[in-house]
Every structure is written in structure tokens, then in C-alpha cells.
Design a protein with these regions (language model features):
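N-terminal structural segment of carbohydrate-active enzymes
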Residues: 1-128, 136-147, 154-160, 165, ...
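Alpha-amylase-like alpha-glycosidases and glucanotransferases acting on alpha-linked glucans and related
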Residues: 3-9, 13, 93, 103-120, ...
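Short, solvent-exposed loop/turn segments at secondary-structure junctions
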Residues: 15-18, 63-65, 135-137, 250, ...
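Loop/helix patches that line or flank the sugar-binding groove of alpha-linked glycan CAZymes
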Residues: 20, 29, 67, 82-83, ...
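Short, polar loop/linker segments at the starts of domains and inter-domain junctions
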Residues: 20-39, 361-365, 534-545
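Short beta-strand segments at enzyme active-site cores
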Residues: 56-61, 129-133, 258-259, 386-389
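Solvent-exposed beta-strand/loop surfaces of large extracellular or lumenal domains
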Residues: 256, 522-541
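C-terminal beta-strand-rich structural cap/linker in extracellular carbohydrate-active enzymes
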Residues: 536-560
Length: 560
């Protein structure tokens, strides 16, 4: 991994991204609503992402998962529909860790080859591949038919008469049948599981509810859930099996793994497995989905993760500021919370789990998030991630099936994304069919991402918070200012969460010049988002005049 480049991750779900089926119906089947394919993610699509500033593509929904679509004609085990959420199913209810999902293949029999070709195309276009690794749980009917010769399947040798054994891959509710509160069918259609296995969200009884992850089974990493005791010597078989899965995909050319719900798996496993993978593939990057600031340090410095989701710190704070629930000045607390770890944070404002920025449930307008995007992308050297269609203002409106109208693009249903569909335009990848607002949003994201790629002060530079000397010069409820500096270049970033423009005169303290090694004097300056230029004094005694647009920001580049 090149530590001098700013990582920009684009999350792309092939089943949704290139699906252009017109007139989708509610809760439709794949025959009715269609599905995007890996082969449709061609060089034109990939070049458009690269040209926008993307360095890594996170392909979601690649690994085979539970679905109500019947592929038994291709030798794929058919899922019982009562343990599948939505017609398309959750991409996080894995049915075979060693196989590719048939929905996204043009030729189902060649699905692995189509994935390998996608990896090759992505690399040829100068980007890296990120793949999901789901370590905590599998689909209730997990069964690997594609596993390499000699590989023992999960649960194959489990002693099902024991609730917990360090030699088992699952937890068993002995003497009990699986009896969730949701309908499991009747007669030949009924889903039967005996003994019941523990459910994925740490539900260690036979009766999970509808809001539980009832379609999944919890994996056993050698922790007895009743007393918390750890049984890690000898190495549990689940550890070995899951590490082998990581090595399998790394051998396919996967450059990074986005690891699902890592805090539900013991940090000792990550310490062991990440080291094992990096012995053979030292450049493979590990990204953690993690929601507890208190264990950030452990999962970085002991677990071995390169990057962690900073959801409960920066993401939550930015969303609260846009909604006028917190002050812009409270962003100071965010970098202080992760001080010393900030380079390991993965910043974002959208992914498949979170509300669409433009959704009525979030901000109702993607442009209201512009100042938050500027902060998330430029505050540190850490990676920035965006979700498919975020750059167009997809709003996730309307119910398409299982998910309902929840402000998200459904991952459970066969559906499309209206703005992405217009932009994709059957492979043309053109702005001509999208509306002016979507064009403005895309242009904004392109400027931000390209700036992240080209400005060393963002990708490598130091950070200096200017708020402590400027509370009298701005509205701390709505405005935030900071410096990024590298070598002979300084960026002065100002953002405005207010509905009105703001004219500011900002103080740059002498301590900032000393701390960052900035030379004062008359300098050439350029505002990178608007292109405006000026020559002015940049020193501790000179006020820096800036005009902040409503719901926007500026990035002034000062060349010394």
C-alpha cells in the first residue's frame, strides 16, 4: 500500500449498480426486476470512477448468499424462502464462502471466471479491489459446494449434542428446534432446524424475533458465551477455516477486505488471522466495520486492522451538525477522540447501512451535506468512502420490497437506483440524462475527490484546528475552520453549515506557523473549489478574509 496516496473507496453493489430493468414492481423477482452483472462493470464504468478520483472499488454482494431465486439447475443449493430476507436476500447471509453469487453473472456456470475478470479489469484501470469478509455469521443453510478439495465445511464435524465446544463451528441449543417468531412455513415448505443454532446477533436461544438476524447463524470462535471464557489453545477450527477463506480470495487478487461486524469476533482471532494473511500477501489491507470508540485502539494495535469505520465519532457528529443538533465547533472533540489513531479511521457519509443523505429521513437534500463531505474528506490523511449514487444524490425514496421505505437503497430486493440508472444509461456512463441537480452534485464530488488525490497537504499533511482563536470571528454553531499543511503548501479549510453565506475574518495564530513550520509573508492563493485567486499576506498579524457559501465551504491553497 502506498501510504502517500489518499485512499478513496467507492462501494458498488453489482446487482444494483448496472440494473437497468424498466418499470420495476414492488417485491419483484429477478425475472420481473432484473439484476446488474459483473460483466457490465466494464472499462467505461471503471474509468469513470477512476477519473472521479476513486482508488479502490468495494464490490458488495460478490460472495454467494441466500436468495429466493432458484439456481438448483446449476447445482446450487436452493434456499428455503422462510430464512431469506427479501427476494434477492441479504449479501451478508453467506451460503458458500468459496463461491460467487449467481445473480450477478451473465453465465452462471462461469461466475467465478467473471469475477476474476472483473478483478483484472479493475486493476487494469488503475484501481484496487475491496471484498466483503463476513466473519461473524453465515446463512442458516450454509453449505459450501465450491470449497477446494480437502477443505472441511463449517459444522461438518461439530458435536451437535454440546451447546459449546471449542471444536465446534456453531453453537447449538441442544434439545430445541429453531422456533423464531416469524413464519417458518408448513408441510414440505417448512424450514426445520434441529437442534437450533444460535442466531447471528448473539441470540443464544431457539426463539429469535423478527428484528433479530434470524436468517443467520452465529459462528463459534472459541468463546463460551455463558461465562465469557476463551478457549484459543489449540487454535479453534473456526479460526483456521476462516483464515483459509481470506487466503482463497487474496489469491484471486483481492487487495483489501472490508470485514463485517468485527467487534462480534474476538480481537485475538484478528491478531492471528491478519498476521497469517499478511505473511503471504503483505500489501492486503484490512478494514473494520466497528461501532465502539472504546476498542478502536485494540483493534488497530493488537488486532492489526489498517482502517476502522469512524461511524460513532465523526459520521454521527457531522450528521448531527447538519440537522442543527450539535455545533460545528464540536468537531474539535472528534479529532481529539481519535488523536494518535486518526490516520487509521475510514471516513464516510453513506454506505449500505446508513441513510441516504438526500432521503427524507436524513437531510432531504444531498447538497445540504456538502460541508460535511468537505470535512469528512479533507480533515485527515485517512481514507474517504462514498456509496454508489451518493455522487448523484440518490435519495432511496419509496418501498421496493422487504426493506420498506426506510431512506436506504434496499440490499434485500431486486431493484434499481433511478439516478444511477440514468447516468449508467446502458453502459454510456454519461451525465446527459441526469438532471441539473445531479450534475451539480457529481461535479462537487469530483472536485473534492480529485483534490484529495492531488493535494499532498490532504494526503500527507498535518492538521491544525483554528477554532480556539476564532470563536469571536465566526458562528461556532455553524462554521468550522482548520489548516492542513505539507512542505511548502498550506490549505485553509472553512465550512459553513448555515443556510446563509458568511463573510469571515480568520486569525491564524503564531503557534500554527511554528507548529507546522509555515513561512509567513505575501503569498499566492487559490481557492480550489471555485478557482478564485488572490495574492495576500499570510501571517499571524493578518486577518484571512474568506466568504463561505451557504451549506458549503472553501479550500484556500497558500503557496509559500
Amino acid at each position: 500500500m502506498n501510504n502517500k496516496s489518499k485512499i478513496i473507496i467507492y462501494q458498488l453493489f453489482p446487482r444494483l449498480f448496472t440494473n437497468t430493468q424498466p418499470n420495476s414492481v414492488f417485491n419483484g423477482t429477478i425475472a420481473q426486476n432484473g439484476a446488474g452483472k459483473m460483466n457490465q462493470i466494464d472499462t467505461r464504468v471503471l474509468n469513470s470512477l477512476r477519473d472521479m478520483g476513486v482508488t479502490h472499488v468495494w464490490y458488495t454482494g460478490i460472495v454467494q448468499h441466500a436468495s429466493k431465486t432458484d439456481y438448483s439447475a446449476y447445482g446450487i443449493h436452493k434456499s428455503n424462502p422462510h430464512v431469506v430476507k427479501g427476494n434477492a436476500g441479504s449479501p451478508y447471509a453467506i451460503t458458500d464462502y468459496y463461491d460467487v453469487d449467481p445473480d450477478i453473472a451473465v453465465d452462471v456456470n462461469q461466475r467465478m471466471k467473471e469475477f476474476e475478470q472483473l478483478v483484472q479489469r479493475t486493476h487494469a484501470c488503475g484501481m484496487k479491489v475491496v471484498l466483503d469478509f463476513v466473519p461473524n455469521h453465515v446463512a442458516r443453510q450454509y453449505r459450501s459446494l465450491a470449497k477446494p478439495k480437502g477443505v472441511e465445511d463449517l459444522g461438518q464435524t461439530d458435536d451437535k449434542g454440546m451447546f459449546f465446544s471449542p471444536n465446534n463451528n456453531f453453537y447449538y441449543i441442544t434439545g430445541k428446534s429453531f422456533s423464531p417468531s416469524v413464519d417458518m412455513g408448513e408441510g414440505d415448505d417448512k424450514y426445520v432446524e434441529y437442534p437450533a443454532k444460535a442466531t447471528g446477533n448473539d441470540c443464544f436461544h431457539e426463539c429469535p424475533g423478527g428484528n433479530d438476524w434470524f436468517e443467520t447463524v452465529k459462528l463459534n470462535y472459541g468463546v463460551d458465551p455463558w461465562n465469557g471464557s476463551k478457549h484459543f489453545s489449540p487454535i479453534p477450527s473456526t479460526w483456521t477455516k476462516m483464515c483459509d477463506i481470506l487466503l482463497f480470495w487474496a489469491a484471486k487478487g483481492v487487495d483489501a477486505f472490508r470485514c463485517d461486524m468485527v467487534h462480534m469476533v474476538p480481537v485475538e482471532f484478528w491478531h492471528w488471522a491478519i498476521a497469517k494473511v499478511k505473511e503471504q500477501y503483505p500489501d492486503v489491507v484490512f478494514i473494520a466495520e466497528l461501532y465502539d470508540v472504546g476498542i478502536y485502539h485494540s483493534y488497530i494495535h493488537y488486532g492489526g486492522f489498517d482502517y476502522l469505520y469512524d461511524k460513532v465519532n465523526l459520521y454521527d457528529k457531522l450528521c448531527a451538525i447538519v440537522k442543527n443538533e450539535e455545533s460545528a465547533a464540536s468537531l474539535t472533540q472528534c479529532w481529539q477522540t481519535v488523536e494518535g489513531m486518526q490516520a487509521h479511521m475510514l471516513n464516510f457519509l453513506e454506505n449500505h447501512d446508513e441513510l441516504r443523505l438526500a432521503s427524507p429521513q436524513q437531510f432531504g437534500d444531498a447538497e445540504l451535506a456538502f460541508p460535511a463531505v468537505i470535512v469528512s474528506a479533507t480533515m485527515s490523511t485517512s481514507p474517504f468512502m462514498l456509496y454508489q449514487g451518493q455522487e448523484l444524490g440518490e435519495d432511496g425514496k419509496g418501498a421496493t420490497g422487504y426493506s420498506g421505505d426506510d431512506g436506504r437503497t434496499s440490499i434485500f430486493d431486486y431493484t434499481t437506483m433511478p439516478l444511477v440508472e440514468k447516468w449508467y444509461s446502458h453502459g454510456k456512463c454519461s451525465i446527459h440524462k441526469i438532471n441539473n441537480k445531479a450534475r451539480r452534485i457529481r461535479a462537487f464530488y469530483t472536485k473534492i475527490l480529485k483534490m484529495c488525490a492531488t493535494e499532498q497537504a490532504i494526503s500527507q499533511g498535518a492538521f491544525f484546528d483554528l477554532m480556539y482563536v476564532n470563536y469571536q470571528n465566526l458562528n461556532p454553531q455553524k462554521q468550522y475552520v482548520y489548516l492542513r499543511h505539507f512542505d511548502h503548501e498550506t490549505l485553509l479549510v472553512g465550512v459553513n453549515f448555515h443556510a446563509d453565506d458568511a463573510e469571515l475574518e480568520i486569525d491564524i495564530p503564531a503557534h500554527a506557523f511554528q507548529c507546522l513550520g509555515i513561512h509567513s509573508g505575501v503569498c499566492f492563493m487559490k481557492e480550489l473549489l471555485s478557482g478564485k485567486q488572490k495574492t495576500a499576506e499570510f501571517s499571524p498579524t493578518a486577518k484571512f478574509q474568506m466568504r463561505l457559501p451557504a451549506h458549503g465551504g472553501v479550500v484556500w491553497k497558500i503557496v509559500h
